[in-house]
């Protein structure tokens, strides 16, 4: 296996086009394990850990753009993710150990495409756009399409994820997850909610995204539809849990994990929604 170090974005894209069956390595927290366990067999590794262009967090008018090489720790230390974007900071703070948060990148979390990836539900709730670059040019893909349509929208062999962009939300972004332990926990189930309330405490905007419920992280459209326009009260939150449970019953019918996940989702969804007011 060949290992090549890229110093610029242009060089990284050139190397990707030059070597077939190549893989990108940035933080290495996932891909090194995959190679060691012989789950993947790349002919070349393109190291982008020195590409400074991918390590920026930028505020652009109504948007925030996160470079694919930004680490979880970078997000936690950025003042942009205070206030109504606290849910993204919380999701990043719950990833693995300090060592993993210092090395692991947001771009790697997306491209690795684990259903348990903590950073993805908040980015789905924010309706983020992924910026993919190759020698053929630039392509923009909605993150929900990237996960829900598989090969149609998924990253191509010669493409590099360079950035994640989303519009600054008016509502509050939250995140909650259930793992098997307090630290180093891989999510068994997670929820991110983006909710905006009017002066009468009525839901005027809502996005709900889940992780680890099924094979892919996804929007929970039925819960969104139920919550929209309702006064944000405890009984409404309770009913939204039932809506999500009924949706899970259809999606996970016959799966042995359904009874556990059906019970667990109540606490996770309630925690995510309760943080809207905090």
Where are these regions (language model features)?
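C-terminal structural segment of proteins
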Residues: 1-278
């Amino acid at each position: 296996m060949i290992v090549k170090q890229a110093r610029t974005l242009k060089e990284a894209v050139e190397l990707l086009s030059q070597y077939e069956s190549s893989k990108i390595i940035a933080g290495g927290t996932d891909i090194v394990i995959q190679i060691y366990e012989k789950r993947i067999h790349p002919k070349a590794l393109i190291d982008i850990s020195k590409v400074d262009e991918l390590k920026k967090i930028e505020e652009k008018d109504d948007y925030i753009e996160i470079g694919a090489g930004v680490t979880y720790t970078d997000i936690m230390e950025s003042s942009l993710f205070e206030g109504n974007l606290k849910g993204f900071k919380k999701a990043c703070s719950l990833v693995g150990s300090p060592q993993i948060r210092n090395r692991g990148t947001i771009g790697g979390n997306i491209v690795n495409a684990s259903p348990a990836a903590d950073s993805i539900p908040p980015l789905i709730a924010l309706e983020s756009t992924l910026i993919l670059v190759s020698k053929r040019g630039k392509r923009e893909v909605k993150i929900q399409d990237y996960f829900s349509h598989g090969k149609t929208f998924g990253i191509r062999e010669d493409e590099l994820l360079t950035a994640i962009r989303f519009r600054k939300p008016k509502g509050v972004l939250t995140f909650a997850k259930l793992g098997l332990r307090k630290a180093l926990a891989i999510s068994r189930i997670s929820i991110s909610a983006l909710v905006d309330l009017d002066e009468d405490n009525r839901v005027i905007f809502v996005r709900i995204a889940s992780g680890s419920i099924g094979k892919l992280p996804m929007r929970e459209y039925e819960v969104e539809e139920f919550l929209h326009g309702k006064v944000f009260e405890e009984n409404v939150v309770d009913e939204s849990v039932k809506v999500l449970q009924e949706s899970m019953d259809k999606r996970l019918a016959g799966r042995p994990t359904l009874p556990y996940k059906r019970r667990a989702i109540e606490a996770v969804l309630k925690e995510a929604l309760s943080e809207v007011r905090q």
